[in-house]
C-alpha cells in the first residue's frame, strides 16, 4: 500500500466547453487516482466531480477585445489571486483549459515558480497572432491539442505538443438519432425543425440574437411549415433571447429549451449557429448548418489585421476547404443568413455527411484518456512510477 500524499491538480476553465473538457480529464485522472484533489476555476460538470472553484467560471466568459478591456481590472484581480493561491498550494500540475488570453499569462507565472504547466486546447496560433507560440513555449511544459493540424505547427517550432483528439468526437455517436432526440425534447416527430443557436455568452447574444430571429422570419416565408427550436445555456441567456424575440419578431414562435444543445441539434433538420465549439458539435451530429458571427466593429477591425486564415468555422478548418457557409460581420445579415439556410435545407446532404463522417473518425481518439496520460507523463517524475499504471 502506498502512503503517498494525493495528487493535486490546479485547473482553470473559462467557459462551458472548457468545463466539459475539464470534467472529462478529471474523470480520466480519477480512474487511477481516486483521491486526487482539484482546485481553481471550473463549471458545474467539474464541480459535480469534486472540483473546488475559487471563482465563478462566468468571471472569465468574456468575448471580444473591447469587451475584455472593460473587464480587465477584474480579470487581473482574479489572476493575481489565483497565482497567490496556486503557488501556496504547490500542485503537482496546473492545467489551463482554453481561455488562452487569461491562462497563458497565468501559466507563465506559475511555471516561473516551479509548477508544471499544461495548456489544454491550443490557441489558434496557426490562424492569428502566430508569435504567441513563443510565449506558449515559455509558459507551458506541454500543449494538448484537439485538432490534428495543430501538432504539426508546434512540432515545427519545437514546442512539446500532444494531439489527443476531441472529447465531443468520443461522446457523439456516428449516427445521431433524430427521432429519439425529438421524443426526449417533446418535439413533433414529423415536423421540419431549424435549430437556432446564438451562442452561450451574453456578448454573443447581444450581437447575434437580432439577425438570427429576423432571419427566422424570412426563412419561414420559404418554408411556411418550418418550426424553430433554440437551446439556451441558462435563464440569463433565455431572458436575453426572449427580449430580442419581443423586440424584433414578436409574432415568431420559437420553442426554447434550457441546455441540451446537442439533443436540439440532433432533433433538427438544419442548424443556424454562432461560430465556436458548437460548430464542431453540429458537424459530429451531422446536420446541415450555416455558421454566422459578429463582434463589435473595433474588435473586428483589430482581429482582421491579425488573421492568418480565410476560414473560421471548425468544420471548414478541419477539412481545409469550404464545407459549410460562413457569414461573418457585414455578411451576418438576416437576408444573407436566410438565403444560406434555404440553400442548405434544399440541397442533397449526402456528400457533406460523408465529409463529416470522415472528420469524425480523425478526431475520435479517446481524448480524455490521452490527455490524462500526457498529464501523468509530465507529473510522473514527482511521483513513483508505480503510482500511475496507465502511463505504461
Curated annotation (Swiss-Prot):
It is an enzyme of class 2 (transferase). GO terms for molecular function: lipid-A-disaccharide synthase activity; phospholipid binding. This is Lipid-A-disaccharide synthase. Pathway: Bacterial outer membrane biogenesis; LPS lipid A biosynthesis. Pfam families: LpxB. Its EC number is 2.4.1.182. Keywords: Glycosyltransferase, Lipid A biosynthesis, Lipid biosynthesis, Lipid metabolism, Transferase. GO terms for cellular component: membrane. InterPro entries: Glyco_trans_19 (IPR003835). It catalyses: a lipid X + a UDP-2-N,3-O-bis[(3R)-3-hydroxyacyl]-alpha-D-glucosamine = a lipid A disaccharide + UDP + H(+). Belongs to the LpxB family. Coiled coil: none annotated. One of its GO terms (biological process) is lipid A biosynthetic process. Condensation of UDP-2,3-diacylglucosamine and 2,3-diacylglucosamine-1-phosphate to form lipid A disaccharide, a precursor of lipid A, a phosphorylated glycolipid that anchors the lipopolysaccharide to the outer membrane of the cell. It comes from Shewanella baltica (strain OS223). It comes from the Bacteria.
Amino acid at each position: 500500500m502506498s502512503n503517498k500524499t494525493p495528487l493535486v491538480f490546479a485547473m482553470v476553465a473559462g467557459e462551458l466547453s472548457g468545463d466539459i473538457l475539464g470534467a472529462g480529464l478529471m474523470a480520466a485522472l480519477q480512474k487511477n487516482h481516486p483521491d486526487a484533489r482539484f482546485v481553481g476555476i471550473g463549471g458545474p460538470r467539474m464541480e459535480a466531480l469534486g472540483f473546488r472553484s475559487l471563482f465563478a467560471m462566468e468571471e472569465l466568459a468574456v468575448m471580444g477585445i473591447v469587451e475584455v478591456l472593460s473587464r480587465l481590472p477584474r480579470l487581473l484581480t482574479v489572476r493575481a489571486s489565483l497565482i497567490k493561491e496556486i503557488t501556496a498550494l504547490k500542485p503537482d500540475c496546473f492545467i489551463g483549459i482554453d481561455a488562452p488570453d487569461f491562462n497563458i499569462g497565468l501559466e507563465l507565472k506559475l511555471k516561473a515558480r516551479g509548477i508544471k504547466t499544461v495548456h489544454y486546447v491550443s490557441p489558434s496560433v496557426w490562424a492569428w497572432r502566430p508569435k504567441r507560440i513563443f510565449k506558449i513555449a515559455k509558459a507551458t511544459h506541454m500543449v494538448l491539442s484537439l485538432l490534428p493540424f495543430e501538432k504539426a505547427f508546434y512540432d515545427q517550432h519545437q514546442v512539446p505538443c500532444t494531439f489527443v483528439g476531441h472529447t465531443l468526437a468520443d461522446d457523439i455517436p456516428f449516427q445521431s438519432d433524430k427521432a429519439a432526440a425529438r421524443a426526449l425534447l417533446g418535439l413533433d416527430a414529423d415536423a421540419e425543425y431549424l435549430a437556432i443557436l446564438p451562442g452561450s455568452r451574453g456578448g454573443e447574444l447581444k450581437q447575434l440574437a437580432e439577425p438570427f430571429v429576423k432571419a427566422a422570419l424570412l426563412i419561414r416565408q420559404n418554408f411556411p411549415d418550418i418550426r424553430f427550436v433554440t437551446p439556451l445555456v441558462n435563464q440569463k441567456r433565455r431572458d436575453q433571447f426572449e427580449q430580442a424575440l419581443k423586440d424584433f419578431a414578436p409574432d415568431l414562435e420559437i420553442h426554447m429549451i434550457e441546455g441540451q444543445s446537442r439533443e436540439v441539434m440532433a432533433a433538427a433538420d438544419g442548424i443556424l449557429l454562432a461560430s465556436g465549439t458548437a460548430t464542431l458539435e453540429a458537424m459530429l451530429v451531422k446536420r446541415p448548418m450555416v455558421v454566422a458571427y459578429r463582434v463589435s466593429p473595433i474588435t473586428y477591425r483589430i482581429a482582421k489585421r491579425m488573421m492568418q486564415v480565410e476560414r473560421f468555422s471548425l468544420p471548414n478548418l478541419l477539412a481545409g476547404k469550404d464545407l459549410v457557409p460562413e457569414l461573418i460581420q457585414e455578411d451576418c445579415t438576416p437576408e444573407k443568413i436566410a438565403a444560406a439556410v434555404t440553400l442548405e435545407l434544399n440541397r442533397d446532404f449526402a456528400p457533406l455527411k460523408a465529409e463529416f463522417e470522415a472528420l469524425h473518425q480523425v478526431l475520435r481518439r479517446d481524448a480524455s484518456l490521452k490527455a490524462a496520460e500526457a498529464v501523468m507523463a509530465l507529473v510522473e517524475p514527482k511521483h513513483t512510477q508505480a503510482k500511475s499504471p496507465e502511463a505504461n
